[in-house]
Every structure is written in structure tokens, then in C-alpha cells.
Amino acid sequence: MFSLKPPKPTFRSYLLPPPQTDDKINSEPKIKKLEPVLLPGEIVVNEVNFVRKCIATDTSQYDLWGKLICSNFKISFITDDPMPLQKFHYRNLLLGEHDVPLTCIEQIVTVNDHKRKQKVLGPNQKLKFNPTELIIYCKDFRIVRFRFDESGPESAKKVCLAIAHYSQPTDLQLLFAFEYVGKKYHNSANKINGIPSGDGGGGGGGGNGAGGGSSQKTPLFETYSDWDREIKRTGASGWRVCSINEGYMISTCLPEYIVVPSSLADQDLKIFSHSFVGRRMPLWCWSHSNGSALVRMALIKDVLQQRKIDQRICNAITKSHPQRSDVYKSDLDKTLPNIQEVQAAFVKLKQLCVNEPFEETEEKWLSSLENTRWLEYVRAFLKHSAELVYMLESKHLSVVLQEEEGRDLSCCVASLVQVMLDPYFRTITGFQSLIQKEWVMAGYQFLDRCNHLKRSEKESPLFLLFLDATWQLLEQYPAAFEFSETYLAVLYDSTRISLFGTFLFNSPHQRVKQSTEFAISKNIQLGDEKGLKFPSVWDWSLQFTAKDRTLFHNPFYIGKSTPCIQNGSVKSFKRTKKSYSSTLRGMPSALKNGIISDQELLPRRNSLILKPKPDPAQQTDSQNSDTEQYFREWFSKPANLHGVILPRVSGTHIKLWKLCYFRWVPEAQISLGGSITAFHKLSLLADEVDVLSRMLRQQRSGPLEACYGELGQSRMYFNASGPHHTDTSGTPEFLSSSFPFSPVGNLCRRSILGTPLSKFLSGAKIWLSTETLANED
């Protein structure tokens, strides 16, 4: 219904194989025995030898020869040839350099050059011609191309059909995670790649934090105690943990334990639950220190009982507030774009970044980006979340997020509000616990929204939009976040790996039900366990080495306990507004709800400045005036890193997340450029500060603590004594704007040097028109 089919690939000359030159004559396919590295439960279903992976479109001299393999987990290209032009590779322990998980594949296109035929392959389809070329379009914007010039035609056809079949399963239990976990239970083996696997539940298992050696586990909110600790952490004295949904007896799309107002009895909740869509009772999210609470709730479908139940719920929330403040209700369905609109915007964004040749889009790049509406929607979610922060923080009102089912838009808004209000959720462990609480356990439909089973009518990238909005905050307040944008990008990539239970199911109940059925069919004894225990995405040691995980750390971050010394005295850290700003121009004089007013919008037609939507009907002029005053006062003061942060949401401040959307486009790389250069220098400084701090602690401490300090591992990837940095005055040659990802080996297009897009990637102001860019020196 609301999804758009992936855009059909454009087969222009830049996609066709180049004229054969002496390069091909001189490059003989290597005849060697190449074997894949398989995970437990992974099996090879088809393979073909003498395959050529295309590295560039204008020459074949960089192409690699090897074997193309399709397993029940990934497609893998195995070669002995070194990757040309590549200076650095960020290795995932689960995937090889040329591997693509099956759940990351969006579209498979086969081509026959001689017959000038092409076909988009679906599951269980027949292929009437022998393919000479295979093009794989990935969900993360990668395009990978293989040639079968020297391969057996039947073998090439079979491997193409196998990839199409296994990348588009129709049943949840056909996803690789089930085979992996089943093998683990049968073999009683708790290791993967030699690293112990997580023992957590289907929500993903607690896992350690991103840093090497971190012992802080991510709470999964699968138990009573996790919710109770969160109540105590936030000081929500008027709320209690309720267990009426144990065994999912009330709702199959809520967690077994929920937090409700203390004044509501279990019996009342059971009666009320029948009136809500999906029986999704009000679900507590978070409480402010002033007593105001953030609550999410589905619509009341019983029209006759709607007023009565709504009044009872609001009264209970009011009683839970120490000041008995009123409740502010936000109807997200009326305020924000729906999931269909978000999906349509993402499809347009992907088509702009991937499918169209740059020569055809260069003159209309800025207006085309604006027309996707992706940045507009990111801005809309940030703006509305900031307005709710005002209600909670300044007005001391409890906020109820109301949505038809309460498991899509409310996930994103509730998470953004908490990131803005609570510095704990800006740490790595806190951010992971937030995703567990507001997405995984609250019933966000990862299976459908990520389209793991190729049901495109239910697909919508709301989780990516949340990560994008979080990146906007990180970009504006870099010192307020413990994690880096690399962490956010890798987190998004992990949703496309069908090994982790975290991003595999529509609800905790579905995980328990499906895994129990699978265990019975495979004669697996579960004992007292509630379903199979899937690997945890939060156990990052499954995917990356301790050294690589240090790239998750943000060198800008100033922890709450970190002091700074001024004039010989220790003071808490506070940044001025000027030093905080990473924006392209100052804040305009007329600020309205965090955006510039109509009279200050630039009139340029191709501008990316996004015009404000009309304010919600429920807001009065007085509320608008109060909100405007709150934002104006907040932005006039120095920002407190350990308090509230608010986004600047004018068009000049909402940017395209280049690392996420352009990292696989070779032409978009800026060698020795991009934000990574600043990241590199600041990492060196942060590492030096850490070393000096350890030395000071060793001087002041006893032998035991001094010994511990000496063993402390650097939290920075780049450090003065590390293997990746020998000259502190220079920049490593492998750095580029795509770091730590390498786009080499993905489908290349013609050069874009000198075009508006290349200037945009180099940091040109996005509100300038094509004509202005053309006139720049």
C-alpha cells in the first residue's frame, strides 16, 4: 500500500561492460582452491568459479578474479587478488571484505550483453537467458557488479537464481539467525569466530558497551528489575512496575513488564486494555526531575468508552505528578508525516544518491535533494520533539504521545525527547538502553519496517530517520555525545545483518513464539528459557576487534565527571554558545519554535531552507508565544552539556548525513578530507590528555591503582604511539571522507569533479543555488 517499489535500475552506457582491451587479455583467471569462512549453521547453497568483480566502469585493469558463493547467510566473493586502490579496510568479523548479507540485498538484476536483455529477479522465478552480468543493489546504497565472461553459463544462472531465492525468504524461520542459534544449541558451542557469544535474551543480550574492556551491560528491559532500576534512576516516585502482561496475556505487542501510574489498579488496566488498539495500554517512557512524565499510548477504539477511559488515564497521570500538573496530549498522526510519506522520501533519496548518473543530476542536485523531502521530515521530527521538551522542562506538564497503534512515530519522538533531555541517553550504554526500551521492547516492527521478508508494502525507515536526527544533534553538539557518527552508521548496518535478535522481530512476543516453534521442530530442549537466545547486537565484540571499536568513541565528548582547570581552580565544564555552534550562520533574530520566521526565509527557488508547517491546531497563540520565548531564552545562554540540548532546525542547520548516504560512492570520496581529519587530530589530543591523566593518577595513587593505570588501553583509535599514526604533524594517507568505510569495489560512475555535487560534498553551503556555485572561484 504505502511502499514504493525500488526504482528500476537505469541501464545506460555507464553500466554496460567497457570495451575489452589488453587488460583482459593479460589477466588470466587464477585457478586456486578458494574456500569461504562459514559461521555455525551456515551452508553453501551454490557457487560459480572464474567470476570477475568489477571495480571500475571505464577500465577492467582493477577487476578481481575469484569465486562467487551464495550461502544461507550472505553472498561472498572470494579472491586471492589484493583490493586495488584501497588503503584501509574496516573489517567486520562476521563478514569478509567482499561479503553482502542476504538481508541487505534490495534488488537483483541479471543482464545478457549479447541479447541486450535484462531481468529483475524475484524468488522462484525462471531465467530464460544465460546471464553475463549480475548487478546487486543493496539497502545500504551499495551497488556491486559481477561478470561471468569466463564462467560456465549454467553455473552462472544457478548462482543468480540461488541468490534471488535465498535473499527473499517468505518465512521468518528461514532467516539465518534461526539456523545459527539452532546449531549453537545442538553443539553447545558458545563461540563465534573464537569470541564468546552473548547469553542475553532475544532482545539482543546485554553485551558489553562499545569500548574494549567495558563491563557496563546494556539493560534489555526484559525483566522486572530493569524497569524498576529505570524508575529509581529517573526518580519517578508516582509510578510502578506492572506485571499483568506476563506471558503476553494482555497484549502481544507490549513487553511483559510495563510501568504505569501507581494509582491505577491492575484490574482497571485489564478492563481498559480491551479498548485500546492492539490492547496497547499507556506505556511510561521517562520522568523528569520536576515530576513530569513522558507516556505513549495507542488510540482508544471504543468510541462509547473513549471519554471515560481517557479521563481516567489522564487523572492517574496527573496524580503521579508531585505538583498535580496537567497532561499535554500530542497527536502524532496529525502532527508528523506518516510512515508512507517517510518511505516515499527515502526511496527518492536513494534514487538520487544511487541510481541516477551524476551528469544528469548535477544541475538540479540541490532542488532534487529538497524535493525528496527527507531533510524536511528529519527536521519535522526534531522540531516537534523540541516542542515537547518545552512542555516537560519548562511547563512541568506530563506529555502523552498518542498514535493509532503507538509503535511507529511514537518510538522516534519518545527517543528524541529523551536524548535531548537526559545526558545518560547520550552515552553509548544509555543510547543502547534507549533503543531497547523504546524500540525493541515497545514493539517496533523491525521485521516489517526493515523488510527482512520482502514485504515492501510494510517497509518504512523510521529507525534510520531516528539515527539521522540523532546525528543532527551530534553534529550540532559534538561534545555532548559519547558516541561517534561511525557508531551510528555501524548501528544502522547491523539492522541488515540477520544474526541478531535485536532487529529481527516485530515484538518480544513474536521472538518467543517463533523461536519456541523452531526449537520444537528441531528437537531443541529449552528448559526454563522463554524461547531461543539470539546473539546480541550490543555485544560489539561479535563484529569488531577492540581496536576497531575505539572508533565508536567521540573524542569531543566531555564526561560529566571530567573537570577542567581555569586559573588554578577546578571548575565544571561549560561551553559558550559561540564555541558550541557548528552551524553555517548565526541564529536569526526572529526565532519561532526553533525555526526562522517566514520573513527571513531565503526566496531562492532552489534553496534547501524548509518552510515551517502550520502549528498544530491544539496549540493556542499563548502557547506559541511561550514556546517562542523559551527557545529564544535557551539559545541566548551557554549550552550545558550535561543538561537539555535543543536542535537548531532551520534549513541551514539540517544537513545531509554524508557518511551514511555517500560512503559507498567512490566519486564522493574526499581524499584526506572531510570531518575525519578533525576527528583524527582531536583523537590525538584526547589520547594525550588521557595519557597525562593516567600519569597524574599514578603519581598520586598506590601501587595497585598505578598498575591498573599502566594497563589502561587507549579509548581513541588514533594515538601518538599507535600503529596508525607515526607522525603527529601529518594526516594518515588512508583517511578520506568515507573513513572508516571503503567504497572501492562498488559500482563506479563517471567523474563528478567540478560539479555542484562535488562542491556540496566539499562543504559548500547547501542553500546556494546552482548558479551561485558555478560562479564560485
From Swiss-Prot:
Region (Disordered): 196-217
Entry's Gene Ontology molecular function annotations: phosphatidylinositol-3-phosphate phosphatase activity
Signal peptide (UniProt feature, chain positions): none
Pfam family membership, one: Myotub-related
Keywords for the protein's UniProt record, in alphabetical order: Phosphoprotein
PROSITE patterns: PPASE_MYOTUBULARIN
Modified positions (Phosphoserine) in chain numbering: 607, 751
Domain Myotubularin phosphatase per the UniProt entry, residue ranges: 221-661
Compositionally biased intervals (Gly residues): 197-214
Swiss-Prot/TrEMBL GO biological process terms: phosphatidylinositol dephosphorylation
UniProt keyword annotation of Phosphoprotein present: yes
SUPFAM superfamilies on file: (Phosphotyrosine protein) phosphatases II, PH domain-like
Claim: DNA-binding is one of the keywords in the record: no
Gene Ontology cellular component list: cytoplasm; cytosol; membrane
Entry's family note: Belongs to the protein-tyrosine phosphatase family. Non-receptor class myotubularin subfamily.
Designated name of the protein: Myotubularin-related protein 10
Taxonomic lineage from the root: Eukaryota, Metazoa, Chordata, Craniata, Vertebrata
